[in-house]
């Protein structure tokens, strides 16, 4: 009787392990074009290795995705080292990319058992942008130049306004005091609002495809406020142990240049292609 009970327990345990290993890898992303494209690229890479995936893309901001990963509701999602360093770990910005990556990798492994994949090959830092004609007319080329123009109307994403490494820290570092309260909106509405003249300055991302397409001027971060934002995937440790998952993500090391990421983003935002189609063509 005892032997049958032990055998039954062993079968239950084996079934549980088999179920966990057979479960599709759940891939998440934040809610803007680049993130969804990267999620699709990861999904395609895993599928080519014979790994079943479940796409949970376009979820929300950094905190939403991080909490889902820690809670075991996601298995991986694309993230940026600077975001992890300042927004998640609440550390003051530093400019050394190697140190940021090392500190982030150690902290994520120690606190949550999470692994950072090799860097994808590009950074996506915050970028303050203006209509090109306005920037030239007003002689604005650097973020510090904005301090002389409090009349300009800023427009920012919700997360940029809330994050310590976003607008609050930027305003303090550069002495910015716009007369108008920043208009807060979804990231996808920033460039249309700029094109329609509803705002004058937006905080986008340096790899946004519409920057070139719209002829915008990106202002130089002349006080080096923003930390490095290298792109990679954050993966649950148990999932990273799967050799096929690891092989798929390691194969993406250094494969996406900044220009390539801008082209991928533009193919979605300007040309109207789906993120899935763009990822397949990558």
Where are these regions (language model features)?
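C-terminal motif of bacterial Sec signal peptides marking the signal peptidase cleavage site
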Residues: 14-16
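Bacterial signal peptide processing site
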Residues: 18-20
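Bilobed "Venus flytrap"/periplasmic-binding protein-like clamshell domains
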Residues: 24-54, 120-192, 273-277
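An extracytoplasmic/periplasmic, membrane-proximal ligand-sensing/linker region
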Residues: 34, 159-173, 244-282
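Beta->alpha turn/N-cap motifs
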Residues: 58-62, 72-85, 100-101, 131, ...
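Alpha-to-beta junction loops
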Residues: 70-79, 150-153, 169, 189, ...
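Ligand-binding "clamshell"
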Residues: 88-117, 196-201, 210-224
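A bilobed periplasmic-binding-protein/Venus flytrap-type ligand-binding module shared by bacterial periplasmic
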Residues: 126-136, 229-242
